[in-house]
Swiss-Prot record:
Residues annotated for Mg(2+) 1 binding in this entry: 50, 53, 71
EC numbers, comma separated: 2.7.8.11
Designated gene of the protein: Pis
GO-annotated molecular function: CDP-diacylglycerol-inositol 3-phosphatidyltransferase activity; metal ion binding
Top-level taxon of the source organism: Eukaryota
Protein purpose: Catalyzes the biosynthesis of phosphatidylinositol (PtdIns) as well as PtdIns:inositol exchange reaction. May thus act to reduce an excessive cellular PtdIns content. The exchange activity is due to the reverse reaction of PtdIns synthase and is dependent on CMP, which is tightly bound to the enzyme. Required for the regeneration of the signaling molecule phosphatidylinositol 4,5-bisphosphate (PtdInsP2) from phosphatidic acid (PA) and maintenance of its steady supply during signaling, thus playing an essential role during phospholipase C-mediated transduction.
Keyword Aminoacyl-tRNA synthetase applies: no
CC cofactor: Mn(2+); Mg(2+)
Reaction it catalyzes: a CDP-1,2-diacyl-sn-glycerol + myo-inositol = a 1,2-diacyl-sn-glycero-3-phospho-(1D-myo-inositol) + CMP + H(+)
TM spans (from-to): 9-29, 36-52, 77-97, 99-119, 139-159, 164-184
Protein name: CDP-diacylglycerol--inositol 3-phosphatidyltransferase
Length: 224
């Protein structure tokens, strides 16, 4: 199948930005245990480009399912890579980092998959009040930023305390301030799974009813 240039989603501007995010994340992974400056800048830039590709998609009218999936996968893989490193740096808290990975990956995957199954135009479109509130642009951007900032601060604290404010480490202060929001985001991720489970169960019920109706004999006809 030949794809016209204006329909080739693989070279859409937001998806090209998505590829750049992947490259930056890979560079960050490579240096994550040895060079926090290179790794930190690459990771943060990759995360910040998450907002840029969304703006590009709207500006160029290039919103695609492929782009949405690429964006989700890059987010999940990027955060997972950082959390794996944090589990290595802070083995005492390994369970919590493992739990964070499990919640983040499983809940978002289920939510995305359910959105596809029920035929939604976007995973951000949902009837649930909490989901609608969470996916408002300003709230979503804030929650994602403070969540990433929390983990980045923990990462940087392994190497340096950073600038001091009244004798206290800036990175440590930011970690304490953003930590509660990271916990809140994890709870919202669990809510994603709950809402997706309800929607998916509704699909199962509807399909089972349709199969029963097809298997039942038509009223008034003789069954042989």
């Amino acid at each position: 199948m030949t794809i016209a240039e204006h329909d080739n989603v693989f070279i859409f501007v937001p998806n090209l930005i998505g590829y750049a995010r992947i490259v930056l994340a890979l560079i960050a992974f490579w240096f994550m245990s040895t060079n926090y400056v290179i790794s930190g800048w690459c990771y943060v830039t990759s995360a910040l480009l998450d907002a840029v590709d969304g703006q590009a998609a709207r500006a160029f009218n290039q919103s695609t399912r492929f782009g949405a999936m690429l964006d989700q996968l890059t987010d999940r893989c990027g955060t997972t890579g950082l959390l794996v490193t944090l589990a290595y740096f802070y083995p005492r808290y390994m369970f919590w980092f493992q739990l964070s990975i499990a919640i983040d990956v499983a809940c978002h995957w289920l939510f995305m998959q359910t959105s596809v199954v029920v035929g939604r135009s976007s995973h951000k479109v949902n009837d649930n009040f909490i989901m609608r509130l969470y996916y408002q642009k300003d709230i979503l951007t804030f929650m994602c930023c403070v969540n990433e900032l929390f983990y980045v601060c923990l990462y940087l604290l392994h190497f340096t305390y950073g600038p001091l404010i009244f004798g206290a480490s800036l990175f440590k202060i930011l970690a304490f301030l953003t930590g509660p929001f990271a916990v809140l985001k994890a709870l919202i991720s669990v809510m994603h799974a709950y809402v997706a489970g309800i929607d998916l169960a509704a699909v199962d019920v509807r399909e089972r009813q349709e199969r029963r109706q097809k298997s039942e004999p038509v009223s008034g006809k003789k069954v042989e």
